[in-house]
């Protein structure tokens, strides 16, 4: 309670349980560290990426819904083919469902940043990338103040951020290489 260092704290007031080593939860303040391998690639990510690619090439391909439903089945939630049969074969509706599935399934895994840029929709409602990031008021002295929704960070998004800058050393190596717009 008297520690004002703010070391090892959440800036937003929210703590993430996903991916946590559950063996450490009940070991008090000083749990013994246990190795837990980090995920580099997840099968669900590949299934959803493949469904997205199939949808762009051939929206009528039955594997699109099968791959999305494989992810949903593993999570124990209703299958798209059962709850939204009307989207099957419709490119736009399937794309919307795949994007939604990626947002939920891959939450806090660092994929959203790249998805939104790949889809080039960072300025659209529901996908916006710039602006304030909200959380709890971590400077509050009481519970009521803590529960107040507070902006703790402001992020910037510019159109040029859809593409990365090409390193100057690479541009200098090639006479035909041109810097990406805005950089």
Predicted regions and their residues:
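Acidic/polar-rich alpha-helix caps and helix-coil junctions
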Residues: 1-183
């Amino acid at each position: 309670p008297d520690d004002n260092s703010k070391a090892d704290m959440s800036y937003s007031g929210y703590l993430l349980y996903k991916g946590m080593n559950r063996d450490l939860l009940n070991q008090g303040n000083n749990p013994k560290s246990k190795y837990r391998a980090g995920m580099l690639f997840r099968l669900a990510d590949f299934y959803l990426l493949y469904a997205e690619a199939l949808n762009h090439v051939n929206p009528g391909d039955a594997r699109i819904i099968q791959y999305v439903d494989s992810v949903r089945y593993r999570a124990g939630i209703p299958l798209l083919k059962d709850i939204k049969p009307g989207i099957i074969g419709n490119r736009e509706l399937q794309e919307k469902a795949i994007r939604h599935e990626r947002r939920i399934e891959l939450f806090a895994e660092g994929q959203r940043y790249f998805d939104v840029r790949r889809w080039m929709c960072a300025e659209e409602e529901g996908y916006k990338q710039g602006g304030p990031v909200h959380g709890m008021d971590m400077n509050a002295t009481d519970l009521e103040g803590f529960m107040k929704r507070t902006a703790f960070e402001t992020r910037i998004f510019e159109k040029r951020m859809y593409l990365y800058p090409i390193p100057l050393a690479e541009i200098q190596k090639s006479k035909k290489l041109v810097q990406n717009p805005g950089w």
